[in-house]
């Protein structure tokens, strides 16, 4: 939208990234708040932040006597046009975004409810329909594509989505990620779990490519049957096939990981998951969505203190009665004998 006067650069140092994250996400307070409401994907969290920011900008615009009746946000051209109209208005800071989100959304709201409450509050405040605030709206799709451009970089983005990035010139942050433990230590953990007789599966909110790149780099992919690695891509394909919303905190990703990514079975995973269960299941995760899914699946929950909250997440896991809590994912070997 070209609001403000800062220059956007593609390559940033780790220190610059940390500073931007602290500035825009209020030292992770906004991310933690969203995750506690089950908003777990990077794209949805970004959408919530930008929707709240647009809401406050449009309030300023309306207060100056301008009509909002012709506001449309469905394409990059619409975004640029709106940016020109909003030039000169103060962009809300992260503290204002946090206050606005918390004021619009009840404490007990789940993921889908978060955006329903936001939309209701925006429409009441601005006096217009706000279809752009919903998940999977055209504006959400623009955020998704922009996020993936930065995360994947030019080469992987074009390889994955079959089109050139809107703003080329990025190497991608995916290649700069580091694991939440030692890469070799995690691989040995996978090997030891298999030696003890456990079958391994993955259920992740990352896309197929986002999962494949680090797993190949650390050789973790060699420890998994690819049919038991369920990604956001698999969930998205199933959602479109069945006409249902299946992303976390819906347990579908866990069913697909545990039972196999077989599209011909997906409808039955949704309607009759118990028919596919065989033995006891353990879910290892660091978020509220993982806890909800473990309960829905009837699985044993092992909470790890490796998420945004770090050790402070212990209180959440205890309140939700997680079966086990460990400091690191590698500590699960002390539980799974």
Question: Where do the PLM segments sit?
Answer:
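Short, compositionally biased "basic patch" segments
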Residues: 126-165
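Substrate-recognition element of Asp-dependent hydrolases with the DxDx(T/V) motif
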Residues: 72-73, 82, 89, 97-138, ...
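Short acidic-hydrophobic, aromatic-tinged amphipathic segments that line or gate anion-handling sites
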Residues: 230-231, 323-332
């Amino acid at each position: 939208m070209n609001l403000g006067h800062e220059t956007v650069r593609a390559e940033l140092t780790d220190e610059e990234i940390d500073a931007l994250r602290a500035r825009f996400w209020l030292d992770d307070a906004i991310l933690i708040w969203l995750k506690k409401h089950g908003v777990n994907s990077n794209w949805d969290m970004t959408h919530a932040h930008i929707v709240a920011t647009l809401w406050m900008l449009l309030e300023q615009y309306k207060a100056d006597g301008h009509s909002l009746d012709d506001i449309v946000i469905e394409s990059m051209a619409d975004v640029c046009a709106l940016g020109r109209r909003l030039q000169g208005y103060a962009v809300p800071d992260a503290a204002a975004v946090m206050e606005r989100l918390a004021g619009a959304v009840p404490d007990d709201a789940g993921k889908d409810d978060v955006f329903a409450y936001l939309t209701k509050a925006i429409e009441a405040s601005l006096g217009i329909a706000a279809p752009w605030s919903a998940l999977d709206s055209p504006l959400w799709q623009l955020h998704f594509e922009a996020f993936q451009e930065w995360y994947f970089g030019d080469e992987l983005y074009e390889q994955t989505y079959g089109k050139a990035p809107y703003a080329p010139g990025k190497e991608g942050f995916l290649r700069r990620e580091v694991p939440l433990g030692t890469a070799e230590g995690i691989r040995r953990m996978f090997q030891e779990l298999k030696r003890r007789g456990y079958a391994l599966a993955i259920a992740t909110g990352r896309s197929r490519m986002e999962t494949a790149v680090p797993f190949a780099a650390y050789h973790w992919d060699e420890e998994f049957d690819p049919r038991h690695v369920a990604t956001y891509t698999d969930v998205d394909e199933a959602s479109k096939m069945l006409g249902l919303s299946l992303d976390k905190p819906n347990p579908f990703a866990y069913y697909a990981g545990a039972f196999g990514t077989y599209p011909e079975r997906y409808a039955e995973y949704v309607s009759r998951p118990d028919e596919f269960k065989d033995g006891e299941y353990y879910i290892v995760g660091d978020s509220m969505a993982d806890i909800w899914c473990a309960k829905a699946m009837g699985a044993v929950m092992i909470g790890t203190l490796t998420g945004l909250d770090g050790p402070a997440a212990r209180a959440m896991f205890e309140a939700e009665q997680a079966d086990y809590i460990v400091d690191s994912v590698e500590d699960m070997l002390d539980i799974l004998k």
